[in-house]
């Protein structure tokens, strides 16, 4: 039987109520979180480390799939951290989205945030002119 939240024929308010009732507090918290990932030249994502890891007492990064097992609300800059071509970046983003939908308990897709104000910031993409103070 298909879960109500996955049934596109049901009213939105029913789907939302069903999904929220199924979610643990940890999964709800994960949906409010964003990960800024590093995409290497080979099209593989890894987590970006920063001082927050040090302040949190995290000595080593957990495997990305372990960190994302509860889901995540947003993936930040999935294509733009290193210079990659658009096809490599999109393939990597698709792999990551597939993981979110197939390997998490509820299969909630992530939102992707990429800088595109003057064009997609990746190798061989067109960037349009803009003023210095945009």
Which positions does each model-derived feature cover?
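N-terminal beta-rich core of secreted/periplasmic extracellular enzymes
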Residues: 1-134
């Amino acid at each position: 039987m298909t879960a109500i939240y996955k049934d596109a024929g049901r009213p939105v308010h029913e789907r939302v109520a069903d999904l929220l009732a199924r979610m643990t507090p940890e999964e709800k918290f994960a949906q409010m979180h964003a990960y800024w990932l590093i995409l290497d030249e080979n099209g593989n994502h890894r987590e970006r480390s920063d001082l927050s890891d040090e302040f949190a007492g995290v000595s080593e990064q957990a495997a990305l799939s372990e960190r994302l097992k509860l889901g995540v609300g947003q993936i930040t800059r999935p294509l733009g951290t290193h210079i990659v071509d658009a096809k490599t970046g999109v393939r990597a983003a698709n792999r990551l989205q597939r993981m979110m939908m197939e390997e998490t308990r509820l299969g909630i897709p992530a939102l992707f945030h990429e800088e595109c104000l003057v064009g997609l910031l990746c190798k061989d993409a067109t960037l349009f002119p803009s003023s210095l103070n945009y």
